[in-house]
Curated annotation (Swiss-Prot):
Catalyzes the transfer of the enolpyruvyl moiety of phosphoenolpyruvate (PEP) to the 5-hydroxyl of shikimate-3-phosphate (S3P) to produce enolpyruvyl shikimate-3-phosphate and inorganic phosphate. One of its GO terms (molecular function) is 3-phosphoshikimate 1-carboxyvinyltransferase activity. Belongs to the EPSP synthase family. Pathway: Metabolic intermediate biosynthesis; chorismate biosynthesis; chorismate from D-erythrose 4-phosphate and phosphoenolpyruvate: step 6/7. Monomer. It comes from Coxiella burnetii (strain CbuK_Q154) (Coxiella burnetii (strain Q154)). Pfam families: EPSP_synthase. This is 3-phosphoshikimate 1-carboxyvinyltransferase. Keywords: Amino-acid biosynthesis, Aromatic amino acid biosynthesis, Cytoplasm, Transferase. Its EC number is 2.5.1.19. GO terms for biological process: amino acid biosynthetic process; aromatic amino acid family biosynthetic process; chorismate biosynthetic process. One of its GO terms (cellular component) is cytoplasm. HAMAP family: EPSP_synth. 3-phosphoshikimate binds at K21, S22, R26, S167, Q169, D315, K342.
Length: 438
């Protein structure tokens, strides 16, 4: 399926975006190995998260999925209650699922194979294989990419590990393995990354130690069931935040969005560019802060993106580059080589698409330079990347003509009702089927 977006006369209204994808992954995983029943409200029923649910069910976890209410009811099997799955666990398109499950499965008393779709089978896994091996895990793979064969070792040993780059997925993988390790596992990161795993461990009553740069867990503890309500995903909200910011006449409100400080890079950067964004009605539930976000149209200016904001914005850069494309002046983004090993090479995909829409965009080995200009209509390829597809749908709200985006099926991995909500606030997006994603 492809998308076609035509220029908007302005966005308006109030919407609630679906539950946070990162928190959904972690919540169901921890609930599955907790003792007792956990109800998860606001679970994201996207393909990536449902792949995690399926994997846990295949290992004996009882998970009732109430899809139309976005609710899971999880009967935890306890720390030692998982069973060997009957076949390889398919993580679909989800890098988060395969990396979190690798940490969980490294300390089990059985062997497992983790695999995924063709995109996932190109994603780098050396970053988790090396530290897990230091803990005593044995993992076979060809070329350090999936499929991964994990030979479970219930006698893992805790380690002190310095992450070479800020990565919430790697950090979380090692913390999960640390739950099953003898002694203490401590992870030090060079810059803050999203901390949902740490917050959820606390929510499930697991003791951990944390300072400014390090987080430690000791093995042998227990998780206790605890109901959780998942806030809206700021990565999904970001598409509407940018669309309203760049489209004249816009004013929208996004309700109950997660505003974890480790995820606020997109708001911080847009404000640096001149955006009119107001965050109100702060509450905190299940250790996670939530708020309403009001956005009005504003004229933007290009900026040099500070390195300390990169880990806080890593998933939102595709749509942030759309904002940069219509800002006055030049925007420079560096230190984001990680974007080249996402679902697709996001640097190359964004530069290619922006150039096709008339924007001067230059690819760097670790980033991009964009000279703000006027978006023209045209056709771009999402390269089967959900965030690229939605970013260019946002571009179409301000382009001089229709923007057509090819190969958008993977939007279902993170935002199944994107088109519905986009049209509700006036973005004029429609799905089109046919050759080449149209």
């Amino acid at each position: 399926m492809g998308y076609q977006t035509i220029p908007s006369q302005g966005l308006s209204g109030e919407i609630c975006v679906p539950g946070d994808k990162s928190i959904s992954h972690r919540a169901v995983l921890l609930a599955a190995i907790a003792e007792g029943q956990t109800q998860v409200d606001g679970f994201l029923m996207g393909a990536d998260n449902l792949a995690m649910v399926s994997a846990l069910q295949q290992m004996g976890a009882s998970i009732q999925v109430i899809e139309d209410e976005n609710i899971l009811v999880v009967e935890g099997v306890g720390m030692t209650g998982l069973q060997a799955p009957p076949e390889a666990l398919d993580c679909g398109n989800s890098g988060t699922a395969i990396r979190l499950l690798s940490g969980l499965l490294a300390g089990q008393p059985f062997n497992t194979v983790l695999t995924g779709d063709s995109s996932l089978q190109r994603r780098p896994m050396k970053r988790i294989i090396d530290p897990l091996t230091l803990m005593g895990a044995k993992i076979d793979s060809t070329g350090n990419v999936p499929p991964l064969k994990i030979y479970g070792n219930p006698r893992l040993t805790g380690i002190h590990y310095q992450l070479p780059m800020a990565s919430a997925q790697v950090k979380s993988c090692l913390l999960l393995a640390g739950l099953y390790a003898r002694g203490k596992t401590c992870i030090t990161e060079p810059a803050p990354s999203r901390d949902h795993t740490e917050r959820l461990l606390k929510h499930f009553h697991y003791t951990l130690q944390k300072d400014k740069q390090s987080i430690c867990v000791s093995g042998g503890g227990k998780l206790k069931a605890n109901d959780i309500s998942i806030p809206g995903d700021i990565s999904s909200a970001a598409f509407f935040i940018v669309a309203a910011t760049i489209t004249p006449g816009s004013a929208i409100r996004l309700c109950r969005v997660g505003v974890n400080p480790t995820r606020l890079g997109v708001i911080n950067l847009l404000k640096m560019m001149g955006a009119d964004i107001e965050v109100t009605h702060y509450t905190e539930k299940n250790e996670e802060p939530t708020a309403d976000i009001t956005v009005r149209h504003a004229r933007l200016k290009g900026i040099d993106i500070p390195p300390d904001q990169v880990p806080l914005t890593i998933d939102e850069f595709p749509v942030l580059l759309i904002a940069a494309a219509v800002a006055q002046g030049k925007t420079v983004l560096r230190d984001v080589a990680e974007l080249r090993v996402k679902e697709t090479d996001r640097i190359a995909a964004m530069v290619d698409g922006l150039q096709k829409l008339g924007i001067a965009a230059e690819s760097l080995p670790d980033g991009v330079i964009i000279q703000g200009g006027t978006l023209e209509g045209g056709e771009v390829n999402s390269y089967d990347d959900h965030r690229i597809a939605m970013a260019f749908a946002v571009a179409g709200t301000l382009a001089k003509g229709p923007v057509r985006i090819r190969n958008c099926d993977n939007v279902k991995t993170s935002f199944p009702n994107f088109v519905e909500l986009a049209n509700e606030v006036g973005m004029n997006v429609k799905g089109v089927r046919g050759r080449g994603g149209f």
